[in-house]
Amino acid sequence: WADASIAVQPCVLAMDSGGAGITSQGNASVNLTGCSMRSNAAISTGGSGTMSAAGFYAGSSITGSETGGPLFPYDGTISDPYAHYSPVQDALSQLGSSSGPAFNDKPGVTTPLVSGIPKFWSKWDIQGSVVLSPGIYYVNGDISLGDSASLSSLSSAGVTIVMGGVLTMRGGSIISLSAATKAVYLNGAIPGVVFAGNSSNRSSFNGNTGTKLTGVVYYPNGALDFGGTSQGGTTGCLEVIARSIQL
């Protein structure tokens, strides 16, 4: 986490003070161990979903009865913890500097991709299985995963995907990726950050329950739908930062 001054670090942070904040609908089950949930706007739960965390902090109201943990409504706002973190901002600033080719594959085919070859992609349309080597990947446009598609990395390989479009997952698609660590980061991967995007549109991490992400998912301008597997912890955790978040 780039801002160590926050006492109980958020695993889920919605930054827009005038928007939807954090919402939970349907049967979503969110268990944040050792970290908090924070919205600069409201936090609301509905349906049969449950949420538990070390604390719930909101710039306005907290509504719904299915929250397990201390509630802190009208607790003010916090700033973007990565707004001045140069590794992330420098990477985002490179998007659009070169268009690059599009990636398309076929169901049932496994394709390895190597960081920097090419440096920029225009989009990824994944129908089969894509396996990433360690490093950073720039995708100027959208990333889409079709039914039963998968996006993963080599064992112990830390990756960062920097993208300018939206991410969508269909059906039984799976993403299994981990960010690099400060001890081991190769080929430009940003330690701790697995996804960074600058789109103002809505991305959806709503694939198969096998989806597992370790690191920060950073979409400061866009809305994120994070289904089924939303989880976090103190070690090897998932941290989600976006304009607004639906669980």
Residue map of PLM features:
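Short, structured interface segments
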Residues: 1-6, 28, 63-97
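Long, polar low-complexity repeats
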Residues: 2-48, 103-247
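Short, polar loop motifs at secondary-structure junctions
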Residues: 41, 60-62
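Intrinsically disordered, low-complexity effector regions of RNA-metabolism proteins
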Residues: 98-102
